[in-house]
Amino acid sequence: MSIFAYSILAGLAPLLSSSIPFFTLRNRNINASVFHILLCISAGLLFAVASLELIPESMNLALRSFEESTKTQTSLKSTTTKTTTTTTTIGNIKLQKSFISNSEDSLNEFHSLDNEINKPPIEGLNLNNLNQATNLDNNEEDNDNLDNDGENEIENDHDHDHQEDEGGDNDHDHESEEKKEFLKIPMYGIGFGFAILIIVESIFSSIDGGGGGGGHHSHSHGSLSSSSSNDVISDYISNNNSNNINNNDDDNNNNNNNNDDDDDSVELLERNVVNKDNSNNINNINNNNDDEDIIVINKSIENTPNIASPVMNKDNNNNDKDKNRNSNKSDIKNSGSINNGNNSGNNNNNNKSKLTITTFIALSIHSFVDGVVISSAFSSSPHVGARVALAIVIHKIPDGLVLSSLILSQKKFNSGIFSNPFFYFLLISCMTPLGSFISSFLFGGLSLSSGAFVLGFGAGTFIYITSTAILPEILSNQIVKKSTSLFSIFLGYLLFIFLDSQFHGAH
């Protein structure tokens, strides 16, 4: 029951850490830069969880698995290799020899020698004479071999040491190669986590109809609309140029009849004409009626009093053309930027929705893995399981902050059951007890090597989200400066280091 108690506690930790900031900040008019900074902090937290918790823990499990495998092989060798010593006496002669129990040739030699020794004595053979003859032969052989004993012992010791050195080097090389194979297990998990999320994101991209390509199309359509509007205005300006040139001749003929009062009235009329032109241009560009644009502007010019004609000279006409050209270009730029802004806003919403779904899947996998780890730790010992479970409870608080930051950055909260963010918070919380239940009752606990793979898998999902989803969104957004974004990411990384040090310092 303690396994499920700790699993439920580990599930409640992200539920509380995500619900409190979400329900506190969702109805407040907070600047968009605040949500952007929260997103940056969540990126730092995710990368810290992957690099400082999951990957080191998976490496530790892989090394422990290697040590257990080495101990098992050593114990098997020690149990299968036993030495047997036999002593047989024939009169005053003692025969002693050691045999290795796992060698069939040595056992056969032992049995044959034992049979020879235990044969009945030959009739008429005097054992005393045999003993004396044997002793004389042995003394002569001992005297002959005294000089060679030292040399043989030195050579044997040298050969034995050389064989031990070669055997030790071979064992060391084999051990290092085996350790490398065990350390590859977390790396396999990281790669598998990347592959799974790539498949998930490609599925959601195909469902959304290729959201990534929409951004490019929005820019191209915006440029096409701007170019067509530019053609309309350029035609209008060229027509006005021809009309103004014709009017310049009449204006030059009537320059001598001008006075100061007429100049003041001309300036007022000139402003009215420009204002009418600008208002008509904006309305007609938004409605995409190119022909009506020219007609309305020409009518506004024709309906002006005749007092403008005798006093408008060449300089005034040039000023009017410059003002009209600048106002028309600014109108087109504004309309193009509005269209592009709407399209980019739609693309950002699509990216944020895919980002949140991908993050939700990764956090769900991570919560499931936490339940599996708690179950595996308790299967080794209750003390180790309790410490691992408490560590997971503390480390899951940043997970809730990550999810709440991502959802708050969207600024869209629906009241439906399946569209409410609290529903997804609850699902993530339930994944930890579910992982403990499946690991304990269905699989009977995971081995150390399997745990290393699972932790590596969770680390791979977090690194994928941080590097391919959150960081591009942060760097492409211009709400705050890039230096502020990078500092916020670093702040999130330091926040996890602080929480981790406080927890380990307490223990």
Swiss-Prot record:
Sites carrying sugar chains: 31, 240, 298, 328, 342, 351
**What is the topology of this protein in the membrane according to its UniProt annotation?**
Multi-pass membrane protein
Q: What segments bear the compositional bias annotation Low complexity?
A: 125-137, 221-258, 333-350
**Region labeled Disordered — which residues?**
124-179, 209-264, 305-350
GO CC, alphabetical: membrane
Q: Where is the composition biased (Acidic residues)?
A: 138-154
**Where primarily located?**
membrane
Pfam annotation, one family: Zip
Ranges that cross the membrane: 35-55, 185-205, 355-375, 388-408, 422-442, 451-471, 486-506
Q: Which family does it belong to?
A: Belongs to the ZIP transporter (TC 2.A.5) family.
**Purpose of the protein:** May transport divalent cations. May participate, with dstA, in the regulation of the differentiation of stalk cells during development.
Q: What is this protein called?
A: Protein zntA
Lineage, top ranks: Eukaryota, Amoebozoa, Evosea, Eumycetozoa, Dictyostelia
Q: Which gene holds the coding sequence for this protein?
A: zntA
